[in-house]
Amino acid sequence: MEKFEGYSEKQKSRQQNFVFPLLFQEYIYAFAHDYGLNGCKPVEILGCNTKKFSSLLVKRLIIRMYQQNFWINSVNHPNQDLLLDRSNHFYSEFYSQILSEGFAIVVEIPFSLGELSYSQEKEIPKFQNLQSIHSIFPFLEDKFLHLHSISHIEIPYPIHLEILVQFLEYRIQDVPSLHLLRFFLNYYSNWNSLITSMKSFFLLKKENKRLFQFLYNSYVSEYEFFLLFLHKQSSCLPLTSSGTFLERIIFSRKMEHFGVMYPEFFRKTIWIFMDPLMHYVRYQGKAILASKGTLLLKKKWKSYLVNFSQYFFSFWTQPQRICLNRLTNSCFDFMGYLSSVPINTLLVRNQMLDNSFRISIRMKKFDTIVPATPLIGALSKAQFCTGSGHPISKPVWTDLSDWDILDRFGRICRNLFHYHSGSSKKQTLYRLKYILRLSCARTLARKHKSTVRTFMQRLGSVFLEEFFTEEEQVFSLMFIKTTHFSFHGSHSDRIWYLDIIRINDLVNPLTLN
């Protein structure tokens, strides 16, 4: 633990002590503009659809709070606080929103400066194509075929909001600003409760999106920080002491000699001491930790994560939130795809001169399919179908024009096909297409007060079919199944597009209203 404390001290060298004085400066909007924001561009407040604000309003509110009369009225009339008076929706919601947003902007400045200096020192090259979400799937296909086990980690754990404030003390040594942050966290009564799931945390973020997004990112940053520390400690590459390095070499030679004498036992225990090949991928509130080591090594890593996070985060980490599975016997839900690495048996016929024989070859394949149940549930929540997948009309859209209704349904269908184009099986997509097409027809029939059959005969199903199958031509990577005996080649083609920069709303159920 002393090594970790020394390792973490290096990361605290850029602590800032000027956040609170900077917050109450008159020209805070200038700092926000230099930070990369547009001071004149209004930012929409979630929960206040009719009100917008900019950093200039933040400056005016801070100047008004800095005046003596504002605080005198707050002291003389504590039950009628202009900022905390819930009876006045404008003061209780609008002022608290813009003040907390301004606080989040100022606190982000030292973190952005640190990231900027780090990127300038490392000179990290930027590739536009790697910004696509689909670019990670070819990486997983290339790496996961050689791995053996996988761990599913749920982030965040149940954590008190006070611990989130304590995380900022590593970077910001400013007591007034931390007290101001506690003021925002205590503004709503339910903010003092534990965060028990990613959904509840997202609901809190909807009240104050920028501030809680900053707190969540700081929490994940600290979590990945000690995870990186554990990974570096398990590797001999960063060792600088020659004596320790020689001891490691002698130990490896002894293990090699031991493996010659006891090959069976050595094969089971060697991966505990050797450096594993590990890959870490995080997606929203989940993380995937894949390794080439055995299941026993993954259990050791699980023990490290539980014990170390219990000491560092000062709370009990539930071991059941870290699931260990063999990669060939399990599947994982990642970014709207159900991915797995099954072992397929391929029968090959080999002929040499007059003799012919068959060879059975076992091969790993990275398979990605579209889960039907979550997507049908998302369509049901959006009122396109029932819970069992039966298409229904959408009465909310009956006031729109026919072209707007067709355009909305068609855009949803094209986005689904575009995002899930990497699926090796397209049957689920065709089922979703059928649900959306029939829901569109029933919506139009309800608008014109006719039956679906009459409306389809009058409009024609050919127009709807051409409308839904219209696809935009983009540069893509194609991975085509080269099997000569496939009668459904179009169902197995996998296409990864390089222009997808955001997750589909139906894939992420947290974004559905």
From Swiss-Prot:
Coiled coil stretches, renumbered: none
Subcellular location: Plastid, Chloroplast
GO biological process, one term: RNA splicing
Statement: the UniProt record of this protein carries the keyword Plastid: yes
Keywords in alphabetical order: Chloroplast, mRNA processing, Plastid, RNA-binding, tRNA processing
Principal localisation: plastid
GO MF assignments: RNA binding
InterPro entries attached to this UniProt entry: Domain_X (IPR024937), Maturase_MatK (IPR002866), Maturase_MatK_N (IPR024942)
Listed GO CC annotations: chloroplast
Function recorded in the entry: Usually encoded in the trnK tRNA gene intron. Probably assists in splicing its own and other chloroplast group II introns.
Family from the record: Belongs to the intron maturase 2 family. MatK subfamily.
Entry-linked PANTHER family: MATURASE K
Protein name: Maturase K
Organism of this sequence: Danthonia spicata
Gene that specifies this protein: matK
